[in-house]
């Protein structure tokens, strides 16, 4: 049975801090990969946490291992631009995701 998880990612060693996110190496491949995960319902919502090197994803999955496995295919992870820092089961108690 699937459930929700809060996942945080952070910029890794290969991140070029002189460039904006959209100009990082393989931006288009990363964006297409994430868009596909969102289109299939794996990624529910997500985006950068302003003022930090981190991003937050809300993911629907069976377990943390599934998340790690799926996200390991991200072109930015393979290039060393991103790393997952936390995968935590999350319960939505206020509002809705539609």
Label the predicted regions.
Residues 1-98:
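Conserved, structured core segments of small domains
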């Amino acid at each position: 049975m699937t459930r929700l998880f809060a996942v945080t990612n952070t910029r890794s060693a290969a991140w070029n801090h002189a460039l904006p996110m959209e100009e990082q190496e393989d931006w288009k491949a990363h964006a297409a990969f994430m868009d596909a995960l969102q289109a299939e319902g794996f990624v529910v919502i997500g985006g950068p946490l302003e003022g930090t090197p981190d991003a937050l994803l809300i993911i629907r999955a069976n377990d943390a291992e599934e998340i790690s496995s799926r996200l390991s295919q991200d072109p930015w992870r393979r290039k060393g631009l991103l790393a997952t820092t936390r995968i935590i089961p999350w319960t939505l108690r206020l509002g809705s995701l539609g």
